Amino acid sequence: MGDNYNSESIQILEGLEAIRKRPGMYIGATNARGLHHLVWEIVDNSIDEVLANFANKIKIILNKDESITVIDNGRGIPIEIHPKTKVSTLETVFTILHAGGKFDSNTYKISGGLHGVGASVVNALSKYLKVEVRKNNKKYVMEFHNGGQILTPIKEVGSTSETGTTVTFLPDEKIFKETTIFSFSTIQNRIKQLVFLNKGLEISLVDLREEDEEKTVLYQFNNGIKDYVLELNKTIGTPLNDVFYVEGIEDNIVVEFGLQYNDNYSENIFSFCNNINTHEGGTHEEGARLAIVREINNYFKNQINKNNKGNEDKFTWDDIKEGMTIIISIRHPEPQYEGQTNQKLLNSEVKKIVSNIVGKGLSSYLLENPEDAKKIIEKISLSLKATIVAQRAKEITRRKIVMDSFSLPGKLSDCETKDAKIAELYIVEGDSAGGSAKSGRNRKFQAILPLRGKILNVEKAKQIKIFENNEINSIITALGAGIKDNFNDKKLRYQKVIIMTDADVDGAHIRILLLTFFYRYMKDLIENGNIYIAQPPLYKVENSNQIRYVYSDNELELYKEELLKQNKNYTIQRYKGLGEMNPEQLWETTMDPERRLLLKVSVNNAFEANLICNELMGENVEPRKKFIRENAKYVKNLDV
């Protein structure tokens, strides 16, 4: 540093070096999420071939050496010399940022992904990458290593009657220091969604990493979004109508839409543009809402209430959406998104197009299916009545939220600071543990809210019951930010909301109930990274004058082996509840920011999160049993 600021101080990062220097700019992070982003980039390139109707099969292989292979039966990346770079087009695509067919409207009318950065970014962040191209009855191979350096130039290696591209890459552990291990379930969830969104597409996933068994899944849904709605509704409740499905095209914009009601109380709405999940909605969702409200009210006025005077709409969107499951997917040649994350669609013309296509389809569906229409109107009418009854409870809740700290819940032991950026709220299971937490905390920035027993299961409860529940009201009031559409993170009183429960079955159940509530009513808390799970120790190990707190069975076994080697005697205490620790121990092990372990709660796949919420917390028992059977093997600590 100092005064040596001259021309030599200015770095020019060339080629793929810039990507390796700042990987977060291209894949978000270098954790497990960023690692899997590499897979999505290569898969997205194959999906672009599917969208262009040149491919219908994709195969993903998790190899023994922890590399991954993506195979498609598309046209194959061009191998001719590129007129601008003077090297093969294949080399250009994998070594130059923003090089790709996505920028040429003649090559891809519609595409997803990061618009041409994918292949080069994956290459830059890989220890090794091999690409095989099959086209023109020939097979070509090119290899790279050490972050995109050419290992083997492009060469012809044989003949073939097939077409397509195969990419194998091994992530660089120098970049991905946290992990380079791909998750089978993460990839499985994503490809299942892609198959739903691309009618007729077949994707298989093969795991070769286990010595004794090969794990394989294959997905193909010929009804696309219709199957998607059915899959999602399977675990929620009893369907009230056959799936309403419509597809259409207007001004080169393709619209697919599916809707089904169930007897549950929460809505599930997922929207996509060019296979990208638009979590924050946008103009396609606005168009769908406009059409649904219009056509439901038109049907009610013209078919059910036609003898009564008055032409005003009876139902609002809030009345109509209860118990509704919707999937809307559009394909747009020039999508415009808000920000860099592609989470909200902005194209203004989409609203009218979606409204027209969905509106015409829904109008016909209601007229042609009077029994289904009757059930839908009855469901909406009940929702309207419940809304009126719940309004008073909701207003009480809202009034509580805007009150100052003197009106906060009586059992809340608030912190001294009013600075939300450093304040923490511990939601603690039980009064005894709450007492220890109150005594052991740092009063300056840590608040304690004890819960009496299990909170209400919001997945099954009617809205009126939710707003009347004391425990839920205490949480809403303490946080001060409101719920659902009225949620305002600027009013949030604590930066960290930490769930602290016992390490047993009841504690796990309370955590699930709380997470379900936050996901359904304060989703922004999870999406913004405000929710954490405390990790109290499972064991206290004493030997001589030394005490060590142990947080997992695996850690305990390793420590026991270490003590045995040193010929030391020891005693082990198993903590079954937070109340077994005195305030000093609770602070030292679970609450001290310098020593505690917190798990941040995040949602990578909203569709899968909804399925799990519905399976674990919904009315149907069988899906819950199935989930437990399939996931029991992953449980590390169980106290029954």
From Swiss-Prot:
Query: What name goes with this protein?
Result: DNA gyrase subunit B
Q: What does this protein do?
A: A type II topoisomerase that negatively supercoils closed circular double-stranded (ds) DNA in an ATP-dependent manner to modulate DNA topology and maintain chromosomes in an underwound state. Negative supercoiling favors strand separation, and DNA replication, transcription, recombination and repair, all of which involve strand separation. Also able to catalyze the interconversion of other topological isomers of dsDNA rings, including catenanes and knotted rings. Type II topoisomerases break and join 2 DNA strands simultaneously in an ATP-dependent manner.
Species whose genome carries this gene: Spiroplasma citri
Keywords, comma-separated and alphabetical: ATP-binding, Cytoplasm, DNA-binding, Isomerase, Magnesium, Metal-binding, Nucleotide-binding, Topoisomerase
Gene name as annotated: gyrB
Which amino acid positions bind Mg(2+) 2, per UniProt? D502, D504
- Family matches, as InterPro entries: DNA_gyrase_B_C (IPR002288), GyrB (IPR011557), HATPase_C_sf (IPR036890), Ribosomal_Su5_D2-typ_SF (IPR020568), Ribsml_uS5_D2-typ_fold_subgr (IPR014721), Topo_IIA (IPR001241), Topo_IIA-like_dom_sf (IPR013760), Topo_IIA_B (IPR000565)
Keyword field contains Ion transport? no
Checking Pfam families in the record gives:
DNA_gyraseB, DNA_gyraseB_C, HATPase_c, Toprim
Annotated site, Interaction with DNA, chain positions: K454, N457
Q: Which EC number applies?
A: 5.6.2.2
